[in-house]
Regions:
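Signature of the first transmembrane helix
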Residues: 3-60, 96, 155, 212-238, ...
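Membrane-interface junctions at transmembrane-helix termini in multi-pass inner-membrane proteins
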Residues: 124-145, 331-362
Length: 493
């Protein structure tokens, strides 16, 4: 068995790498490439996302679980790996063929068609995506080093080959080849530990049904933000798709750092349920959920009040119109965070994933209907599509709560009260930001005045939030202060 502390550190560093590098390359690409060309890339990237799940067929999630169960049996490992690899290879070839047939028959500019063909590399490369084997073997140190090397190569390649506003094909080729190289490196590494063996059609038939079930569960979320981008790709200008994509990337690159805490606690919650220690389970959900909301709500509200500021810092002045989308995505991250707790820590961990899938599809159906209504009326503003997703997700949260209450899975009162309190405390950020904008008005360009405005807003909001937490004697805040004091005095002692 691998050292769990080393794995945890490697996994954390991996998450940081996956957040830091897009925050480096994103601003560069947004400033270098033309808005229309970058919009075409985002349209193409959205389109290939429709095919990739069918190429992988839920094998990633299924493979981790299947290999983890037989790690002590070499023959079983070889058989399971071979079975899943063969299925993945066939699915990838069929999906790639379907992709080319569809894109060949589609209308589009010559540049857009070229991007479709270049990005096909990412669809075809999916059969090499056996990272689930490395995760099952807990090879997190290898994944970390490989990811670091690949990301550095990607960074160098982007700076070397994407130099002018019309280098979009070069950018697409770099991203596609880097994706294939990433998968190939993992494939070559894992081949030292496994070998291919023959499998029967009976074995294939036996796993197809659970693979399809996992495919539906893992990709039901595509009916939300992904569906928005699909509709925008069809009815809006290319730059509108970029506005949506930039806002989504910016907000969830930041909130994604904190959200990892939710998934980390799932194994411990499952352990408590396994030994019937319901008090420990309830305490951990309440405490973990409260800490999560303590962090995510002020972060979300803070990003909302600085939406346009953050947008032009990240992507430049020409993407200022994405500021509204950033505000909406920032506000959306609060119900998203609540849903993450309800679904990952309560519903899923207690074995109600089938019911959860039904709820996802109900919410997705609502989003599909609302998006269709917008498209029918020729509404192409990305902000409206974000609003439809928020509406659908609020319905999902309501159904989550109904499921939890009907089956007596968890008492949500404390969690909801604390969520409401932190939202009330953080709402003062909007007043502070407004007052600062009146006292220190700015132009929407990146200059010293903008940076002063941002700094003043952040400092003022942080001081305000600390004062409020101190006045109400918030338990999380007090315990955090105490922990800091203990560490400081311990070092001095």
């Amino acid at each position: 068995m691998k050292n769990i502390k080393v794995n945890a550190i490697a996994n954390l560093m991996l998450r940081v790498l996956n957040i830091v590098f897009p925050l480096i390359t994103g601003p560069y690409i947004a400033r270098i490439l033309s808005k229309t060309d970058y919009g075409y890339f985002n349209i193409t990237n959205t389109f290939i996302g429709l095919f990739i799940p069918f190429a992988t067929l839920g094998i990633y999630n299924y493979g981790i679980r299947a290999i983890s169960k037989v790690k002590s049996d070499k023959d079983a490992i070889n058989r399971t790996f071979s079975l899943l690899f063969y299925i993945s290879l066939v699915c990838t070839l069929v999906t790639t063929l379907a992709y080319f047939l569809i894109t060949f028959s589609m209308e589009g500019t010559p540049l857009l068609k070229t991007l479709y063909y270049v990005m096909a590399i990412q669809v075809f490369a999916q059969f090499l995506n056996i990272e689930w084997m490395n995760e099952a073997f807990e090879n997190y140190t290898f994944i970390l080093y490989k990811t670091l090397a690949i990301r550095i190569l990607m960074l160098v390649s982007i700076f070397a080959f994407v130099r002018s506003e019309h280098d979009i094909v070069a950018y697409a080729l770099v991203m596609s080849l880097i994706t294939m190289l990433n998968y190939l490196a993992s494939f070559l590494w894992i081949k030292h530990e496994v070998k291919f063996v023959k499998v029967s059609m009976l074995e294939v038939k036996r796993v197809i049904q659970p693979l399809i079930a996992i495919l539906l569960l893992a990709n039901a979320g595509m009916l939300y933000t992904y569906l928005d981008r699909m509709f925008l790709s069809a009815v809006a200008l290319p730059e509108d798709v970029s506005y949506y994509t930039i806002a989504q990337t910016l907000v969830f690159s930041i909130s994604g750092v904190i959200s990892g805490a939710v998934s980390v606690s799932v194994p411990r919650l499952g352990y408590y349920l396994g030994i019937n220690d319901y008090k420990a389970y309830d305490d951990l959900v309440n405490k973990g959920g409260r800490i999560f909301m303590f962090c995510i709500i002020p972060l979300s509200f803070g990003l909302a009040v600085l939406g346009p500021h953050a947008t032009i810092l990240y992507a430049g002045e020409r993407y200022l119109d994405a500021g509204t989308s950033v505000i909406l995505f920032a506000l959306r991250s609060v119900p998203w965070a609540l849903a993450l707790i309800l679904e990952n820590q309560i519903i899923f961990v207690q074995g109600y994933e089938n019911r959860l899938t039904v709820i996802y599809f109900i919410g997705g159906g609502i989003n599909l209907a609302l998006n269709s209504l917008l498209a029918y009326n020729h509404i192409a503003n990305p902000a409206y599509y974000i609003v439809t997703t928020i509406i659908a997700e609020l319905v999902v949260i309501a159904l989550d709560m109904l499921l939890i209450r009907q089956n007596n899975l968890f008492r949500m009162r404390k969690l909801l009260i604390h969520t409401g309190k932190y939202m009330l405390y953080a709402s003062g950020f909007f007043v502070i930001a407004y007052l600062i904008s009146v006292i220190h008005p700015i132009e929407w360009i990146v200059n010293g005045a903008l940076l002063v405005n941002i700094l003043a807003t952040i400092v003022s909001c942080v001081i305000y939030y600390i004062i409020v937490l101190a006045l109400v004697k918030d338990e999380i805040f007090i315990s955090s202060l105490q922990a800091i004091k203990n560490k400081v005095f311990k070092k001095k002692g």
